[in-house]
Structure formats: C-alpha cells, structure tokens
UniProtKB/Swiss-Prot annotation:
<comment type="function">
    <text>The globular domain of the protein is located near the polypeptide exit tunnel on the outside of the subunit, while an extended beta-hairpin is found that lines the wall of the exit tunnel in the center of the 70S ribosome.</text>
</comment>
<keyword id="KW-0694">RNA-binding</keyword>
<comment type="similarity">
    <text>Belongs to the universal ribosomal protein uL22 family.</text>
</comment>
<dbReference type="GO" id="GO:0009507">
    <property type="term" value="C:chloroplast"/>
</dbReference>
<dbReference type="GO" id="GO:0006412">
    <property type="term" value="P:translation"/>
</dbReference>
<keyword id="KW-0689">Ribosomal protein</keyword>
<dbReference type="GO" id="GO:0015934">
    <property type="term" value="C:large ribosomal subunit"/>
</dbReference>
<dbReference type="InterPro" id="IPR047867">
    <property type="entry name" value="Ribosomal_uL22_bac/org-type"/>
</dbReference>
<dbReference type="GO" id="GO:0003735">
    <property type="term" value="F:structural constituent of ribosome"/>
</dbReference>
<dbReference type="Pfam" id="PF00237">
    <property type="entry name" value="Ribosomal_L22"/>
</dbReference>
<dbReference type="InterPro" id="IPR001063">
    <property type="entry name" value="Ribosomal_uL22"/>
</dbReference>
<keyword id="KW-0934">Plastid</keyword>
<dbReference type="InterPro" id="IPR005727">
    <property type="entry name" value="Ribosomal_uL22_bac/chlpt-type"/>
</dbReference>
<comment type="subunit">
    <text>Part of the 50S ribosomal subunit.</text>
</comment>
<keyword id="KW-0150">Chloroplast</keyword>
<dbReference type="InterPro" id="IPR018260">
    <property type="entry name" value="Ribosomal_uL22_CS"/>
</dbReference>
<protein>
    <recommendedName>
        <fullName>Large ribosomal subunit protein uL22c</fullName>
    </recommendedName>
</protein>
Length: 119
C-alpha cells in the first residue's frame, strides 16, 4: 500500500504572543499561500514588530515539515496561516484622586500550517 503524501500537512502554533491580533494579521496576510522560500524574504523587509515572532514560527513549521514528513523546504507552501485573539492581560493604571483606570494588554495565538506544493 502506497502512502499518499500530497495531502499531509504539519503545523506550528505559538500561544500568548504579546501583540495584538490585528497587528499580526497585517503581516500574515502577506505570506498566506506563498512558497516557503518566498515567505522569509517578505518578512525580512517588512517593518513591523509582528514580523519577528511570525518568522520564528515559520522556520519552526518548516523544521517540523522536514523532520516529521520529510518535505523539502523548496516544495513547501504555507497553506493556512491564521491568528486568533488570546487572553487579555488586565492591569490598572493609577490615576488622580485614588482612582484606577483599566488597561487591557492583548495577546494572540498564531498558527502556521505547511503542506507540500501541489504539482
């Protein structure tokens, strides 16, 4: 029996990244559906703070694909890239007359799925 490697995929997940999900979305929209060889170059020249954790996660997903499935990095494509909102860190900032204003610090969960490029 032959194993069909065309539909196999692997993923990498980063949770509780201390950056807003909307700021990460503008970065991951640029690499969705791209070849793995193109995606790190795109992230390198974008000037956003969210590029660093996304590029780390992308290299981790490629390492998972090469180790677990034996995929070549040249044959890999980012099939699914998504970001979800994580838990909100809630803090209070001291204000005048003994009051405190709530401060919400957002987190996000980033998922990158890599599969073999369809020929």
């Amino acid at each position: 029996m032959k194993t069909n490697y065309s539909n196999l995929e692997t993923q990498a997940l980063a949770k509780h990244i201390r950056i807003s999900a909307s700021k990460v979305r503008r970065v991951i929209n640029e690499i969705r559906g791209r070849l793995y060889e193109q995606a790190p170059m795109i992230l390198e020249f974008m000037l956003y703070r969210a590029c660093y954790p996304v590029s780390q996660l992308l290299s981790l997903a490629a390492a998972n694909a090469s180790h677990n499935l034996g995929l070549n990095k040249a044959d890999s494509v980012t099939s699914e890239v998504k970001v979800d909102e994580g838990t909100m860190l809630k803090r209070f900032e001291p204000r005048a007359q003994g009051r405190g204003y709530p401060i919400h610090k957002p987190t996000s969960h980033i998922t990158i799925v890599i599969k073999k490029k369809s020929t």
